[in-house]
Amino acid sequence: MNPNQKIITIGSISIAIGIISLMLQIGNIISIWASHSIQTGSQNHTGICNQRIITYENSTWVNHTYVNINNTNVVAGKDKTSVTLAGNSSLCSISGWAIYTKDNSIRIGSKGDVFVMREPFISCSHLECRTFFLTQGALLNDKHSNGTVKDRSPYRALMSCPLGEAPSPYNSKFESVAWSASACHDGMGWLTIGISGPDNGAVAVLKYNGIITETIKSWKKRILRTQESECVCVNGSCFTIMTDGPSNGAASYKIFKIEKGKVIKSIELNAPNSHYEECSCYPDTGTVMCVCRDNWHGSNRPWVSFNQNLDYQIGYICSGVFGDNPRPKDGEGSCNPVTVDGADGVKGFSYKYGNGVWIGRTKSNRLRKGFEMIWDPNGWTDTDSDFSVKQDVVAITDWSGYSGSFVQHPELTGLDCIRPCFWVELVRGRPRENTTIWTSGSSISFCGVNSDTANWSWPDGAELPFTIDK
């Protein structure tokens, strides 16, 4: 074999070996790809271990956790199927209240990015509960927190965050521009109601799944306002109460029936001797019960109950265990307004059980300090001040504030009844603590149980003043 033939032979062998090697590499790549596809079930999630991803599907927050194990991604999540929250069940039988959440917003906000806010409340879908709140468009320990004692400003907004977390720009979702608000879930989407604008011309903006669906203009031009707690959804319809008119005299009160964000019916209450503000409402066997604030002349709380056709009944809690603040010492109650210390008030709630009533109230008669739950077995209808259970929640030496009801439907809990719950706002700063330039709050919440509970104090606990205040 001459030299040229040797060169040609060696070159041919090298080319053949190269082609075989290339084919083997291609086969290896195909094999790896096929194996990976089988392992992951054709899912394409990549990333580090324990990566938490939150998606917003069908207007309900759904949590997924992807765990990467040897290149195999396993996904766990909740069923996102929409339901209709019926609200037809009765309230669960309870013997006390178990601590549910505490967000420690003010304590965390001394060092972290936490919103200045007030009027927090909680509402639950069939998948989760969320904290809603009215921010002041400012952060704690920042110059824009100055002057946030003001209730109504163009910087206020309704936002929401995961339950039990301090509300920050990193975990909160914008809902509506608002200085008065409500929100609830019908099983298919969130309804939000945000009121903003001038005192003599405010407008309520209704959104369903984040889209504006309706507006309601102030009809008395006297500070249109709503619940500052959750609205109520029953069989696909949601209900809320709004007030327009004086805070120290007879005003106008309307109930609205809303479906998928559209008002389909409304009525005005005929209640010339009653005053309804900041109602705390809940469903019970297909009807809606609201317990409200009388800022005009009652130290006991007014109530209104109505069915899905908006046929309603009104009254006052008769018990001599008075629920408002300020209020007189417990004594002889009335099924009409108790006018002693009846002026002014604070948002609150109660739960009716037959002739009995769970009353939530501040421990102080004069200041928004402390909080307690009292069971009066005949208090809905009888006027004496006898009660059988008192559970301490916040000590009288610590600040409280607004409080309100929320419920957990059977579709969420798996129970055969509606679980009653409540939240308490723990206000810090001005006007009572003048060492600060700001006003804000944290919150705690409790749910009713038929088992052991604790008597204790769960105060805000922040040490004031902050750096910005000095």
Curated annotation (Swiss-Prot):
Instruction: Give the primary localization class.
Output: virion
Q: What is this protein called?
A: Neuraminidase
Kindly give the membrane topology term recorded for this protein.
Answer: Single-pass type II membrane protein
Q: Which residues bind Ca(2+)?
A: 294, 298, 324
Protein role:
Catalyzes the removal of terminal sialic acid residues from viral and cellular glycoconjugates. Cleaves off the terminal sialic acids on the glycosylated HA during virus budding to facilitate virus release. Additionally helps virus spread through the circulation by further removing sialic acids from the cell surface. These cleavages prevent self-aggregation and ensure the efficient spread of the progeny virus from cell to cell. Otherwise, infection would be limited to one round of replication.
- The scientific name of the source species is Influenza A virus (strain A/China:Nanchang/11/1996 H1N1)
Membrane topology, Intravirion segments: 1-6
- According to its UniProt record, how is this protein modified after translation? N-glycosylated.
- Entry GO terms, CC: host cell plasma membrane; membrane; virion membrane
Q: Which gene encodes it?
A: NA
UniProt GO BP: carbohydrate metabolic process; viral budding from plasma membrane
Name the active site residues.
Answer: 151 (proton donor/acceptor), 402 (nucleophile)
Q: How is its activity regulated?
A: Inhibited by the neuraminidase inhibitors zanamivir (Relenza) and oseltamivir (Tamiflu). These drugs interfere with the release of progeny virus from infected cells and are effective against all influenza strains. Resistance to neuraminidase inhibitors is quite rare.
Domain annotation text? Intact N-terminus is essential for virion morphogenesis. Possesses two apical sorting signals, one in the ectodomain, which is likely to be a glycan, and the other in the transmembrane domain. The transmembrane domain also plays a role in lipid raft association.
